[in-house]
Amino acid sequence: MHFRPLHDRVLVRRIDAEEKTAGGIIIPDTAKEKPQEGEIIAAGSGGRNEQGQLIPIDVKPGDRVLFGKWSGTEVKIDGQDYLIMKESDLLGVVDKTGSVKKAA
């Protein structure tokens, strides 16, 4: 199945957190927090301003993003868990070089 978000919404796949600490301690599933990092799978065309002009989305499929712990709506598509959220719920884009750039 193919899913295309509408307007300024994005489809995000969570990127799982590390299962071990830096010191080698294994973190059990019950103690893990929901990851706050994910990958953009699909993005809508953008929102509209008061004049009706299209405001394009700043993220694209493949971007790694950070978001709030309680952001988005959890959905299951083809057995895979995803989040659907507005672009404004994203905190920023993680650059592959390790630096962070701001999203709109």
Curated annotation (Swiss-Prot):
What SUPFAM superfamilies does its record include? GroES-like (SSF50129)
This protein's GO CC annotations: cytoplasm
Keyword Cytoplasm (UniProt) = yes
Which coarse location class describes where this protein primarily resides? Answer: cytoplasm
NCBIfam families for the chain: PRK00364.1-2, PRK00364.1-5, PRK00364.2-2, PRK00364.2-4, PRK00364.2-5
Q: What does this protein do?
A: Together with the chaperonin GroEL, plays an essential role in assisting protein folding. The GroEL-GroES system forms a nano-cage that allows encapsulation of the non-native substrate proteins and provides a physical environment optimized to promote and accelerate protein folding. GroES binds to the apical surface of the GroEL ring, thereby capping the opening of the GroEL channel.
What induces this protein's gene, according to its Swiss-Prot or TrEMBL record? By heat shock.
UniProt organism field: Bradyrhizobium diazoefficiens (strain JCM 10833 / BCRC 13528 / IAM 13628 / NBRC 14792 / USDA 110)
Record protein name field: Co-chaperonin GroES 1
* PANTHER family cross-referenced by the UniProt entry: 10 KDA HEAT SHOCK PROTEIN, CO-CHAPERONIN GROES
Question: Mind telling me which Pfam families this protein's record contains?
Answer: Cpn10 (PF00166)
Please list which residues make up the signal peptide: none
GO annotation (BP), single: chaperone cofactor-dependent protein refolding
Q: Which GO terms describe its molecular function?
A: ATP binding; metal ion binding; protein folding chaperone; protein-folding chaperone binding; unfolded protein binding
Subcellular location field: Cytoplasm
The record's subunit annotation is: Heptamer of 7 subunits arranged in a ring. Interacts with the chaperonin GroEL.
Q: What is the primary gene name for this protein?
A: groES1
Q: Does the keyword Cytoplasm apply?
A: yes
Question: What family is this?
Answer: Belongs to the GroES chaperonin family.
Keywords of this entry: Chaperone, Cytoplasm, Stress response
